[in-house]
Swiss-Prot record:
The modification N6-succinyllysine is found at residues 436, 484, 496. The active site is at 511 (proton acceptor). Keywords: Acetylation, FAD, Flavoprotein, Membrane, Mitochondrion, Mitochondrion inner membrane, Oxidoreductase, Transit peptide. The gene is CHDH. GO terms for biological process: choline catabolic process; glycine betaine biosynthetic process from choline. FAD binds at residues 42-71. GO terms for cellular component: mitochondrial inner membrane; mitochondrion. The keyword Flavoprotein applies. It catalyses: choline + A = betaine aldehyde + AH2. Its EC number is 1.1.99.1. Its cofactor is FAD. This is Choline dehydrogenase, mitochondrial. InterPro entries: FAD/NAD-bd_sf, GMC_OxRdtase, GMC_OxRdtase_N, GMC_OxRtase_C.
Length: 594
């Protein structure tokens, strides 16, 4: 029926036509495989990232289900030790992996016309835990209205009432349970607690500028500024692998592989039956009696669908890939958060500049290795906030992260002086991009085209980001620390100058999403239905950030884990959790911006 909706005739006709070659190849391959012992599981999960780790943990709670988890990258521990894998597990060492291709796909975009022709670097996790093993450990759920919007966009059953219980189920917050927080979940969450004087001064400055202080931006009131929640536990990064995968490894019904690249999904007609993968240079096959589940993320999941014959038929044929199902939404609807750094010199030697000098780094590292304490035990992005950019905006559309340091080129260039900065950017940009296969070779990175700043609305929103940040930085609370403005610089004042600065300096916040959009079967851009099943085929799901219909207002790790928790219940046939009429803050008036 789905292929008929796509205008390609009956599924049977498609199988005899465009699928003929695929079926004959598949039949020969399956016949050949039949002569060998079949490596069969209930579920094959591709990708041990934020979502895949959740699925591995939850699906193997039933001892009758056998699960194979395949990850292209290495394990996140060396010889079972987090200390030996300090680059991953020491929170302050997060920049160490941003350019390390042992743990990172190291993607790059195409040339961005809206960013002065620049090519942007996109680090993505390629390790157990995925990007939750590389990210800044900020735990942000987004706004309740994001999930109401998903419902309106066709993701029925994914409104806030049906998502909040899964946020709670996943979360083990150090502050205990509430209507909004979970206390007993596997994902350990703590509140920023260094009380660095610059963090305190920043929060005071935001209040002097007229913004509220929120005690829990993941609870009743996202709007305002406050201390951030972090996926840090006892001084160590708490990734999805720490939360879900490692506790499940002792189960006999879970097999978790590392350094294993899946090259395609295997089909019998339009039914997914397994995957083909490469390990140690050898090709292997694994079969799923129930389902194959893709959890590779917003780049790898659509890439694997297309390599397997699911995507835009014309594009696949050009690369010689047999078409299983014409699904033109695959790889489309690419969305990402873009951000800019506003940097200010600090007149006092209290920033993290000295902590990045060689001898001091050694001391910090030794303390962390010994006790998991000290400056190595935090990511330092401990305060931030969410505000509305202008009157009439119903809920926050700008996000701030404050850092008592200076970041240059993704941290690849050492800091040059005592300075502090804000990472700021719009959360619901209107520029939408796409990704496509570069070739039929699974090892080739896809073509990534985010189309950053391709709308006038987006550049106007960034203009507001710069102006509103400058207003906060000018408040009295920061006067004792305020030196000259380093970026954009006091000479940048007019709208035209600000726009030029943004186009020259804006960079990705590392939040790609929405490339396998969830929606109704009648939506020609949808890839999966609200049960996470790939449209037009059987026994195949996608569960990760790629299925978001649209971006959430914040970081993506917490929502991705929520998606996987909810999907696990769907897959197991459990009744959906829901919590009706949970109060959510609304401004008293929209006539003012704050």
């Amino acid at each position: 029926m789905w292929c008929l909706l796509r205008g390609l005739g009956r599924p049977g006709a498609l199988a005899r036509g465009a699928l003929g070659q695929q079926q004959s190849l598949g039949a020969r391959a399956l016949a050949s495989a039949g002569s060998e012992s079949r490596d069969e599981y209930s579920y094959v999960v591709v990708g041990a990232g934020s979502a895949g780790c959740v699925l591995a943990g939850r699906l193997t709670e039933d001892p009758a289900e056998r699960v194979l988890l395949l990850e292209a990258g290495p394990k996140d521990v060396l010889a079972g030790s987090k200390r030996l894998s300090w680059k991953i597990h020491m929170p302050a060492a997060l920049v160490a992996n941003l350019c390390d291709d042992r743990y990172n796909w190291c993607y790059h975009t195409e040339v961005q016309r809206g960013l002065d022709g620049r090519v942007l670097y996109w680090p993505r996790g390629r390790v157990w835990g995925g990007s939750s093993s590389l990210n800044a450990m900020v735990y942000v759920r987004g706004h309740a209205e994001d999930y109401e919007r998903w419902q309106r966009q066709g993701a029925r059953g994914w409104d806030y009432a049906h998502c909040l219980p899964y946020f709670r189920k996943a979360q083990g917050h150090e502050l205990g349970a509430s209507r909004y927080r979970g206390a007993d979940g596997p994902l350990r969450v703590s509140r920023g607690k260094t009380n660095h004087p610059l963090h305190c001064a920043f929060l005071e400055a935001t209040q002097q500028a007229g913004y509220p202080l929120t005690e829990d931006m993941n609870g009743f009131q996202q709007e305002g500024f406050g201390w951030m929640d972090m996926t840090i536990h006892e001084g160590k990064r708490w990734s999805a692998a720490c939360a879900y995968l490692h506790p499940a490894l002792s189960r006999t019904n879970l097999k978790a592989e590392a350094e294993t690249l899946v090259s395609r999904v295997l089909f019998e007609g339009t039914r997914a039956v397994g995957v083909e993968y490469v390990k140690n240079g050898q090709s292997h096959r694994a079969y799923a009696s129930k389902e194959v589940i893709l959890s590779g993320g917003a780049i790898n999941s659509p890439q694997l669908l297309m390599l397997s014959g699911i995507g835009n038929a014309d594009d696949l044929k050009k690369l010689g890939i047999p078409v299983v199902c014409h699904l033109p939404g695959v790889g489309q609807n690419l969305q990402d958060h873009l951000e800019i750094y506003i940097q200010q010199a600090c007149t006092r030697p209290i920033t993290l500049h000295s902590a990045q000098k060689p001898l001091r780094k050694v001391c910090i590292g030794l303390e962390w290795l010994w006790k998991f304490t000290g400056e190595g035990a935090t990511a330092h992005l401990e305060t931030g906030g969410f505000i509305r950019s202008q009157p009439g905006v119903p809920h926050p559309d700008i996000q701030f992260h404050f850092l008592p340091s200076q970041v240059i080129d993704h941290g690849r260039v050492p800091t040059q002086q005592e300075a502090y900065q804000v990472h700021v950017g719009p959360m619901r940009g209107t520029s939408v991009g796409w990704l496509k296969l570069r070739s039929a070779n699974p090892q080739d990175h896809p073509v990534i085209q985010p189309n950053y700043l391709s709308t006038e609305t987006d550049i106007e929103d960034f203009r507001l980001c710069v102006k509103l940040t400058r207003e906060i930085f000018a408040q009295e609370a920061l006067a004792p620390f305020r030196g000259k403005e380093l970026q954009p610089g006091s000479h940048i004042q007019s709208d035209k100058e600000i726009d030029a600065f943004v186009r020259a300096k804006a960079d990705s916040a590392y939040h790609p999403s929405c490339t396998c959009k969830m929606g109704q079967p009648s939506d020609p851009t949808a890839v999966v239905d609200p049960q996470t099943r790939v449209l037009g085929v059987e026994n195949l799901r996608v569960v990760d950030a790629s299925i978001m219909p649209s971006m959430v207002s914040g970081n993506l790790n917490a929502p991705t884990i929520m998606i996987a928790e909810k999907a696990a219940d769907i897959i197991k046939g459990q009744p959906a959790l829901w919590d009706k009429d949970v109060p959510v803050y609304k401004p008293r008036t929209l006539a003012t911006q704050r």
